């Protein structure tokens, strides 16, 4: 099986190390980051899982050189994802397919653009960080989620991903991706704004309040589009987690307890958006919180917390702000002002 991994950041690097050397699999990593390429050439790609290290030497190339590909795992940021697919489409084998790993709904957009025979969206429930170029740490274990079904290329995608981490099938990948968006838009954005790790965010009562406020706006935007959030695994029902307690949601004490447990599991995970800001790269804010704002607008719903997040991250992208914990105070001030303005 001829496989390409596009991107060698925290997700792509872990995927590459886990797939390297698998029997019957020819792996190629498409990467344009010169620091990662230099590190890989010097010492290979290195992955730490607990106290154990793995090293893989795989070719890192700036452009495809050996096709056709039976599978292309898209591990890059959502920015430019469709352009990447259009560039690589001629390099796919007749039954080849793209596998998406991004947060947000970018995978669903690609299914609409290229068809279900060419695109398999997945939901990633494990976490990783790139601690230095070409050096990775698995910060939280978990499976890939795929839509249940037998239509090709789903069995092939399942077989490939199961060589990396366990795969679970779900009845509705759209609901799962919206559910993951409710979590990632909160933790990822707040981690970028504050510079805090996920465990630090969830340990703070105010941090948990903000996580819930952002997630509740995602819940309302999804429901307005006819999507009911569902199970994410680990006992977390995203709908009940974000729905008001008086309408069938968990009581506030249980929500805060679940967040503390979630934060503990992902305590070492840093926001990928924070990494983009530190490197002076565009973030995925438009594909996460920006998507929520647009969906809420279409439904005539307010989304002050997600809108304020977009404002602050935009200012950080322009160099007007730096990641720091005090930014959370400004976020709360702006969101509260927007709420008051909408209520008038």
What is the predicted role of each segment?
Residues 25-28, 69-72, 94-98, 143-144, ...:
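Short active-site oxyanion
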């Amino acid at each position: 099986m001829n496989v390409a991994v596009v991107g060698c950041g925290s997700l792509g690097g872990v995927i590459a190390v886990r797939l390297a050397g698998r029997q019957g699999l020819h792996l190629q990593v498409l990467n344009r980051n010169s620091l990662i390429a230099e590190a890989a050439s010097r010492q290979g790609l290195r992955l730490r899982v607990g106290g154990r290290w793995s090293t893989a030497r795989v070719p890192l190339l700036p452009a495809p050189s050996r096709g056709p590909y039976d599978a292309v795992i898209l591990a890059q940021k959502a920015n430019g994802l469709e352009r990447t697919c259009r560039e690589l489409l001629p390099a796919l084998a007749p039954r080849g397919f793209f596998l998406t790993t991004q947060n947000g709904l970018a995978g669903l957009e690609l299914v609409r653009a290229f068809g279900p025979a060419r695109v398999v969206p997945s939901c990633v429930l494990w976490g990783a960080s790139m601690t230095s170029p070409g050096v990775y740490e698995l910060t939280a274990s978990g499976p890939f989620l795929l839509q249940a079904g037998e239509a090709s290329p789903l069995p092939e995608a399942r077989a490939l991903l199961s060589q990396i981490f366990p795969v679970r099938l779900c009845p509705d990948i759209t609901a799962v991706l919206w559910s993951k968006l409710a979590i990632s838009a909160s933790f990822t954005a707040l981690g970028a704004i504050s510079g805090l790790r996920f465990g630090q965010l969830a340990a703070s009562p105010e941090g948990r309040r903000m996580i819930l406020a952002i997630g509740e706006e995602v819940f309302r935007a999804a429901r307005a589009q006819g999507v009911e959030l569902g199970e994410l695994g680990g006992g977390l029902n995203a709908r009940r987690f974000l729905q008001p307690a008086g309408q069938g949601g968990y009581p506030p004490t249980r929500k805060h307890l679940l967040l503390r447990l979630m934060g503990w599991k992902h305590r070492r995970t840093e926001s990928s958006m924070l990494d983009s800001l530190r490197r002076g790269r565009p973030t995925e804010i438009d594909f996460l919180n920006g998507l929520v704002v647009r969906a809420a607008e279409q439904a005539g719903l307010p989304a002050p917390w997600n809108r304020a997040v977009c404002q602050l991250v935009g200012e950080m992208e322009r160099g007007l702000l730096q990641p720091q914990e005090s930014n959370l105070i400004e976020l709360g001030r702006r969101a509260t002002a927007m709420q008051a303005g909408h209520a008038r």
